[in-house]
Amino acid sequence: PVEDCLCPIFAEHAVQSVNALTEKAHSLTPGKKTLISPYGIGLSEFDHPDFEKQMAKLKVDIIAYQDEVGCVRDKFTLPRLKKNWQRMRDIHNRLNIEMWANCETFTWEEGTNDRQSALIPAAYSRLLSQQVAASVAGVDKIISFMFGGIIEDPKSAYQLGQPVWSNNLYNNYMAWKEGDSFWKLFEATLLDKLVNSAKSEMIGKVDMKALADGRVAEEDSGDSRWVRFEKGHHEVVIDLQKNTSLQKVLVRTLNYNQEKIGAPLKVYVYTSQDGQTYNLASIKDAPYFPNNKHDTWIDAVLIDNLKEKTRYVKVAFDALENVYMDEIFVNPSIR
């Protein structure tokens, strides 16, 4: 195999090499489709006058672009990737070449892009965001060149991956695939399709009101839609305006270990009729994934099966490090 970059534009020598290999492949296996999977989507110069011209010279059937999220090409890779997928889709609409996404399922045990550093499983929350970004842009198919040993069936007799966490990634992926309610709600937040069914208003500081404005942030600690909490105990009170049947609460948080940003260990939900006396309704552990040396991703905590009649809801947590939260969904539904 030969790996090359399509950045800043597809070099002429690379185009000629691809076409020569394609011709050879067709001579050996007539009638079969040809696929290439270059890296460099994050560093491509889409506005260069020759970018699309070089792409149009390629005589392949499929280009499966490495999304480079695992390789961490940017400090915050996903926000730019979302835009780049859209730009690449626009180009492919004028080409006779299928556009696939090659989603990187891994992160690095030590240094990034270092052959001495092992590839280990990424959190499924991050991978789902990659799937969503590619799907929204209209890719024709999503694949991954890293599955075995990264996404590991716990029932397999031959365990090749990182103990525990490769199984965790597999279980979460299969839960999403089978329509698990948490993963479908979380996916809807990534698609910006989750809404509050209950009419709610935040009580307290002005910046707390952003937690019920329906605006979700991206995987970037500088995004102004994140509400920032420092170390310590925090309580957020929500007025539902009237006595309401409370079924579930979903809280979104950011994970970015390099800036000491993470989820609280537990989330507590209390209810009250008068806003003075509160009763504990539920406690839920936040998700934990240890392979976080380099990655940025969004997580969520779902507190469901509440079955409470209440007007006021208090969400409480202890922050062992900085907690960034963008939205608290009360009785969330998918639009």
Where do the model's predicted regions map?
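Active-site groove signature of glycoside hydrolases
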Residues: P1-E12
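Acidic (Asp/Glu)-rich catalytic clusters
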Residues: S27, E52-K59, R89-N96, V132-V136
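Predominantly extracellular/luminal regions of secreted and cell-surface proteins
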Residues: E187-E219
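Aromatic-lined carbohydrate-recognition surfaces of secreted/lumenal glycan-active proteins
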Residues: V18-H48, Y65, L95-E109, S144-F147
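Alpha-helical scaffolding within the catalytic cores
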Residues: V18-L21, G40-M55, P79-D90, L127-Q130
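Aromatic, loop-rich ligand-recognition surfaces of beta-strand-rich domains
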Residues: D220-L280, V301-R335
